[in-house]
Amino acid sequence: MITVYGIKNCDTVKKALKWLADHNIEHKLHDYRVDGLDLNFLTQAETQFGWDVLVNKRSTTWRNLDEQVKNSLDKTTALSVLAENPTLIKRPIILQDGKALIGFNEKEYQAAFA
């Protein structure tokens, strides 16, 4: 079973979940707001994608983040800022069975789950 990490009311997460369901791929949602977020997951995601890819700079959370925090964000501070602000994480994320996907791109999903 595939675990999709994200937030259930996110449109991009909804697209990914619908795509998985339409292709009969067993999956479950790990909602950051409901199920929490641990440092181990963030560390794995950072290793796969890099901290700068994990940060969703188009999010409302990013726009509302203190300028000093934004300007000082780097590899050493990113994970703690993301842990404190899970809606700042680009989503959805799938890290499972050698698959590492972030965001939703139908072609990438087709290639990963073919």
UniProtKB/Swiss-Prot annotation:
It comes from the Bacteria. The active site is at C10. Gene3D superfamilies: Glutaredoxin (3.40.30.10). Coiled coil: none annotated. PANTHER family: ARSENATE REDUCTASE, PROTEIN YFFB. Belongs to the ArsC family. This is Uncharacterized protein HI_0103. It comes from Haemophilus influenzae (strain ATCC 51907 / DSM 11121 / KW20 / Rd).
